[in-house]
Swiss-Prot record:
The lineage of its organism: Archaea, Thermoproteota, Thermoprotei, Sulfolobales, Sulfolobaceae. Catalyzes the ATP-dependent phosphorylation of L-homoserine to L-homoserine phosphate. Disulfide bonds: none annotated. Its EC number is 2.7.1.39. One of its GO terms (molecular function) is ATP binding. It comes from the Archaea. It is an enzyme of class 2 (transferase). This is Homoserine kinase. The keyword Cytoplasm applies.
Length: 311
């Protein structure tokens, strides 16, 4: 029985004002997907996992992309798919996107499809449909490419890797006792359909500040760019502790802070000027004030999805 296994890292989407556009892959967590071909003359997908995930192929973020690839390319096979979840689900860390990305990469390797990175993103986006009903591309793009990416087009898929000329580390405040049913879907429903022109202009300034800050290596521009006048504000009921954590992060000279994806996790960028211990200590106390138990994770920028070599 031939098998392939791939690993994809967690990610934080939006990065302030870059809703559905920007995302950052990090080493905080990763998902692994192993796909084995049992037979090539029938069509069936059996799912195994260490987590409580849907076992119906069309409802599973790792396997629905495979269903679509097989339909589109006329591939017939009976598959056994093992999804090893390392990324906490529903916490704004790109869990479904990483599973989808790892699955598509393993499948591409198994069937020698040699998919381009853009095609990996295009197919992995189907996993987000299975997860939340919306094919948002930001998390899967980060998990595919690694680093910080900008999705500049969805049809056709076009992703640009953002050069990082400023060295920073990552702190994540990850709530352990917060569970919001269908969180991503609910969070997307909270995004306003119309916005004030002044908010749009401010957000445009933020996103350009962030990108220029990354490219030119300017700390102050990165800090300014990690702000948002629209989506974070609309979703604040999902993470009421965020404003105070951000205030603490800036107080102790973090590069900047924002909500990780749709939340409720919080992303903090740090460097040698930052007092990480104070941010972790006071940020954890803030979580406790809201009856939220937060784990603080230290991470770095991650690379893209890769096929694991078997010993």
């Amino acid at each position: 029985m031939e098998c392939k296994r791939a690993r994809a890292y967690s990610s934080s989407a939006n990065l302030g004002s870059g809703f559905d556009i920007l995302s950052m892959a990090h080493t905080a967590f990763f998902d692994t997907v192993e796909i084995c071909v049992e037979t090539k003359n029938s069509e069936n997908i059996v799912i195994e996992s260490n987590s409580k995930i849907p076992l119906e192929p069309n409802r599973n973020s790792a396997t629905y992309p495979l269903v679509r690839i097989m339909e589109e390319r006329g591939i017939k096979a009976s598959l056994r798919v093992k999804v090893i979840k390392g990324i906490p689900e529903g916490l704004g860390l790109g869990s479904s996107g990483a599973s989808a990305t790892a699955a598509v990469m393993a499948f591409s390797s198994l069937f020698n499809l040699n998919l381009s990175k853009e095609d990996l993103v295009r197919y992995a986006m189907y996993g987000e449909i299975a997860s939340s009903g919306s094919p948002h591309p930001d998390n899967v793009a980060a998990s595919v490419f690694g680093g910080v990416v900008s999705v500049v087009s969805v049809n056709p898929v076009k992703v640009v890797e953002i050069p990082l000329n400023y060295s920073f580390n990552i702190l994540l405040f990850v709530p352990l006792n917060v569970h919001i049913e269908e969180k991503t879907k609910k969070a997307r429903e909270m995004v306003p359909k119309t916005v004030k022109l002044s908010d749009y202009i401010n957000n445009s300034r933020y996103i350009s500040s962030l990108l220029i800050g990354f490219v030119k290596g300017e700390r102050d521009l990165i800090r300014l760019g990690l702000n948002d006048e629209i989506v974070e504000k609309a979703r604040l009921p999902l993470f009421p502790y965020y404003p105070k954590i951000k205030e603490i992060a800036i107080k102790y000279d973090a590069v900047g802070s924002c909500v990780s994806g749709a939340g409720p996790s919080i992303l903090v960028l740090t460097d040698k000027m930052t007092d990480e211990n104070k941010i972790a200590e006071e940020g954890t106390k803030t979580c406790n004030e809201f009856n939220v138990e937060c784990e603080v994770i230290k991470a770095k920028i991650a690379g893209g999805v890769e096929v694991e070599r078997r010993n």
